[in-house]
Amino acid sequence: KPEREAALLEMVVNKLGDPEPSVAGRASQLLLEVLKAHRAMTPVVAAEVQAFATRAGNGRRALYAAVSFLNQLFLSSQLSELAASLVAMYVALFSAAVQAGELQTKLLAALLTGVNRALPYAPGALGAESEKEVDALFGLSHAGTFSTRVQALALLDKLAANGDGKLRARYLRSLYAAVSCDDARKQSKPALLLNLVFRAASAE
């Protein structure tokens, strides 16, 4: 019955937040096996995991498990709506994590990976519904610690590569402002910032 299947799916997805890593890992593997056998269920399973990922009260371990699972989904042009919703969620979670000062974490890396995977299948991902999160990222790229600014720029770099010319120009202004500030010259490990500069120069 549909009700029983929905309840079972919710139960398995909730196990992604189990404090025992082996249990969370098994839940992720089980969900992937279900999708391997029934690929048409991808939007339904993804929606349940997204609801879990954005649920208040989840710890960072649970959130990382959910994002890691979503990063393994098979995406295509036929799943453009799903891809767009994933991009919007990744951007919102990334912005929230950076604002909370959670830098240099596996979660940020997983979110960047997710954006990279989903954007090619989500041509309309950067619509009006994502404007608030994108504006927040630009705000972070001009304020806070230098590490916060660079992490925000790293995501904006990926969004700008798939956005319009206006977004690209805005990103480049923010990048050059970061490079020109005094803090940039004091960094002992400027690799990420230098990589962003190299990518920007190569694209021009």
In which residue ranges do the predicted regions lie?
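Extended alpha-solenoid helical-repeat scaffolds
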Residues: 1-204
